[in-house]
């Protein structure tokens, strides 16, 4: 999910630049809020959050980006707190709702995570990220068929890149040995079915794995 979340950052950065044009925030501060370095991201987003001229929607985005940095550092309770603020400021942020659902999943707060991801999908029904989150929650709950449906929806909306990511993750999990070609085949489906039957199996690879194969 970390890799999925990072794919949103370029578009969100462009959106934030447009939103803060009249707030007095520097372009460097905005860039820091979207840095790949978590400490710089926390500092940049904190500066934006403290800017009294920032509108609620943009401040919500800054909280969400700082929350992502905390989550990537493993500070999950702090991430939840920032996502709480992001959603309070913008209750229609499907991204913040989905990302909070993911953190709640990581904290084994599955029912709360399911509530969030359902809200996220009601706002953005074609989000591959949210379908992936719900698939993980359903897998953890033992809802194998429902989890499979969501993984398939995630691939449908996420396209070749996400299929490759799953292929690489399932290969790393030891349940798939086919090509990393972005095609959803019967072999890949069988690998998914095996993985979904194992609560500890994650079809997403570790963050630094598969970079070359999926680029």
Feature annotation, model-predicted:
Residues 51, 55, 89, 123, ...:
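Structural marker of alpha-solenoid helical repeat scaffolds
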Residues 56, 60, 94-95, 128-129, ...:
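Helix-start (N-cap) detector for alpha-helical repeat units in TPR-like alpha-solenoids
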Residues 72, 106-107, 140, 172, ...:
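Register position in tetratricopeptide repeats
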Residues 161, 171-215:
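Short acidic, glycine/serine/threonine-rich helix-capping segments at coil-helix boundaries
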């Amino acid at each position: 999910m970390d890799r999925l979340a990072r794919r949103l950052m370029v578009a969100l950065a462009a959106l934030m630049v447009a939103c803060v044009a009249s707030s007095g925030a520097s372009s460097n501060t905005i860039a820091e809020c979207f840095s790949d370095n978590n400490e710089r991201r926390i500092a940049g987003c904190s500066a934006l959050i403290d800017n009294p001229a920032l509108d609620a929607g943009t401040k919500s985005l800054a909280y969400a980006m700082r929350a992502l940095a905390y989550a990537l550092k493993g500070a999950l309770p702090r991430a939840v707190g920032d996502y709480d603020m992001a959603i309070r400021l913008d209750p229609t942020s499907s991204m913040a709702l989905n990302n909070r659902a993911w953190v709640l999943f990581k904290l084994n707060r599955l029912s709360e995570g399911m509530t969030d991801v359902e809200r996220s999908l009601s706002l953005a029904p074609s989000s591959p990220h949210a379908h992936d989150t719900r698939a993980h929650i359903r897998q953890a709950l033992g809802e194998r068929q429902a989890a499979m449906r969501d993984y398939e929806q995630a691939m449908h909306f996420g396209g070749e890149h996400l299929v490759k990511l799953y292929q690489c993750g399932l290969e790393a999990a030891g349940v798939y040995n086919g090509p990393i070609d972005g095609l959803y085949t019967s072999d890949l489906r069988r690998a998914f079915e095996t993985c979904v039957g194992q609560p500890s199996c994650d079809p997403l690879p570790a963050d630094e794995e598969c970079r070359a194969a999926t680029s």
